[in-house]
Amino acid sequence: MTVFLRLFFISLICLLPAAHSFSVENTAASFVGADVCAGCHADQYSLWKGSHHDWAMQAATQQSVLGDFNQVSFEHYGERTEFYRQGQDYYIKTQNAEGKMQAFKVAYTFGFYPLQQYLIPFPDGRMQALGVAWDSRPKAEGGQRWFHLYPDEA
């Protein structure tokens, strides 16, 4: 009987409201930058800096963009994609979801070698890479050209 009473009282205690309430502050995470990491992880940082992982995703700048954006175009199954610059900004003009030509500002590069893609921001907050990418290999190896990631698909 004493075991039953103990279990009964323990069950009742579990049903009582907690005496203390804890509040958890919801703070949004933000990117602090790689240099902050270097302060505590100098060896790992020196191995990472300049590697393909370092270059994996960069803001679209003259230093990071490898593709030819000098008013060139690429056509795949009748769909034309144009690459150009306006000042310091990089643009890709291609068909939008409605099938109409639209210019999209490139926000980021994605990848480095042997290919580089370009990320386009959309109004809903997504970043989208297009089906056309830049082959960053040397020309002698068949690179330095635009190509479609899915060559057999329209």
What is each PLM-predicted segment?
Residues 1-7:
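Positively charged n-region of N-terminal signal peptides that target proteins for export
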Residues 2, 18-19:
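Ala/Thr-enriched low-complexity intrinsically disordered regions
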Residues 8-9, 69, 76-78, 113-115, ...:
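Short beta-strand-initiation
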Residues 26-27, 70, 79-81, 105, ...:
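Short secondary-structure capping/turn segments at boundaries of alpha-helices and beta-strands
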Residues 64-86:
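Short Fe-S-cluster ligation motifs
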Residues 86-154:
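Extended surface/linker regions that mediate inter-domain or inter-protein docking
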